[in-house]
């Protein structure tokens, strides 16, 4: 697993101070002490090998600690023999209010 591309993209657009050091986690049964333990989190240096049948929620969190605001966008994917399958059914069209 690799967070570098995610981090580099956000850093290059001025969000280095706002991003987290992980960008998703596995879904399914995990055991104590918590679901936040390694290897479920997606971060640089994680030794987990992604295999068909695994499900991941990949997300981007941007935080503004000064104003106590946060934003999160994410998608759930099933890993398949040929890549991945997006499990969300919502449209990906840009909505401008």
PLM segments and residue spans:
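Active-site cores enriched in adjacent His and Asp/Glu residues with nearby glycine-rich loops
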Residues: 1-33, 49
């Amino acid at each position: 697993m690799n967070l570098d591309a995610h981090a580099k993209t956000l850093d290059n657009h001025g969000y280095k101070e706002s991003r987290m050091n992980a960008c998703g986690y596995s879904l399914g049964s995990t055991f104590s002490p918590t679901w936040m333990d390694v290897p479920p989190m997606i971060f640089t240096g994680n030794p987990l090998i992604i295999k068909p049948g695994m499900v991941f929620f990949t997300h981007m969190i941007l935080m503004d600690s000064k104003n106590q605001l946060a934003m999160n966008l994410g998608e759930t994917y099933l890993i398949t023999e040929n890549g991945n399958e997006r499990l969300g059914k919502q449209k990906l069209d840009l909505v401008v209010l």
